[in-house]
Amino acid sequence: MKKLLLIAATSATILSSSISFAECMDNEWYLRVDAGVAMFNKEKDKTIGVKLKSNKAMPIDLGIGYYIAENVRADLTLGTTIGGKLKKSGAATNAHFTGTNVLVSHKPIVTRLLINGYVDLTSFDMFDIFVGAGVGPALVKEKISGASGLASNTTNTKNKTNVSYKLIFGTAAQVADGVKVELAYSWIDDGRTKSKHVIHEGASVQTGGMRYQSHNITVGLRFGI
């Protein structure tokens, strides 16, 4: 928790410094909302040795930002990714499960607070093209079901505080006075969940520790305030 508060405070300080610099310029605050579709990277369940695939998830972000210059802006966003799972059925290869057909799923619960910066690369009459990056704290945990959940069939890991990273490429167009719509691709690394040991057939077996990285396509709105 101390790590989470420290990173959050640092993020807020950086954003505040950027805003203080921008106050001498004739720029504006904005609110933003984003939603879309995400797919997690394939990952291996180390407990049973099965490689998992992602179904579709929904990333959602809310934020507040400031136009620092004509082609530069920064914002602070609170986001999550909901509804997605890493899952797979197949033959286990690790000890304790070798040769067993299993069905396993990992459902993450992610909450992230990111400070993001963006630069417009080109500005056309109808739209802009921009790149950006973000960093900040993320709380990550997961619900594991199936063979990897072992004796209870289902197990939950505790929240782990990670540093989340985000890379962004997108385009934006003004649709009304003070309102812009965005279409963007982003890659997010939220880090690994906690691992834990559970007892299976008299032996201590490690589960959890899944890494969550995602590819995201989102549509967003920026409202000047």
From Swiss-Prot:
- Please indicate if the UniProt record lists Signal as a keyword: yes
Keyword Signal included in the entry's annotation: yes
- TM ranges: none
The SS bond pairs are none
Signal peptide (UniProt feature, chain positions): 1-22
- Lineage of the organism: Bacteria, Pseudomonadati, Pseudomonadota, Alphaproteobacteria, Rickettsiales
Q: What is this protein called?
A: Putative adhesin RT0816
**InterPro entries linked:** OMP/PagP_b-brl, OmpA-like_TM_dom
**A GO cellular-component term linked to this record:** cell outer membrane
